[in-house]
């Protein structure tokens, strides 16, 4: 990618259909779309191009963390591209979730595209990799439980 993008790659020991379901169904999103120990409330989930999504997460300090965006592109079992704001910490980014079947496994390439290189560097210093790492660990656990 470029100097504005953070890329995270994960391989899930599950079919692309199952990973897609876990990624796109609100009842599953509520189980994994937050760091460990935090429950996600799916407030809005209009899964179509132009549709909005909004998830709320109560933080241990009593504040509420809001994740929201709008779907830009959806290609079933292949990719989901969305605008995204993670308030109060990160705003004005694009997230690209790219799924690839590899035998009985699914490879995920997750790109976080920032408006500037400086913003990307700031987000890395704030621990963005640890946050998403925890989220994808929870997704992996959910997929294994469903499977």
Regions found by a protein language model. Give the residues of each.
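Hydrophobic ligand-binding cavity/cleft-lining segments
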Residues: 1-39
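A conserved amphipathic terminal alpha-helix motif
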Residues: 114-147
């Amino acid at each position: 990618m470029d100097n504005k993008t953070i890329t995270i790659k994960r391989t899930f020991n599950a079919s692309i259909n199952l990973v897609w379901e876990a990624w796109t169904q609100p009842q599953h999103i509520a189980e994994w779309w937050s760091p460990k120990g935090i429950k996600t409330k799916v407030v809005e989930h209009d899964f179509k191009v132009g549709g909005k999504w909004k998830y709320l997460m109560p933080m241990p300090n009593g504040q509420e963390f809001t994740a929201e965006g709008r779907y830009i592109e959806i290609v079933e079992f292949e990719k989901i591209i969305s605008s995204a704001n993670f308030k109060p910490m990160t705003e004005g980014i694009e997230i690209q979730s790219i799924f690839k079947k590899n035998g009985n496994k699914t490879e995920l390439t997750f790109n976080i595209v920032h408006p500037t290189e400086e913003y990307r560097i700031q987000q890395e210093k704030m621990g963005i990799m640890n946050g998403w790492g925890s989220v994808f660990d929870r997704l992996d656990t959910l997929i294994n439980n469903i499977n």
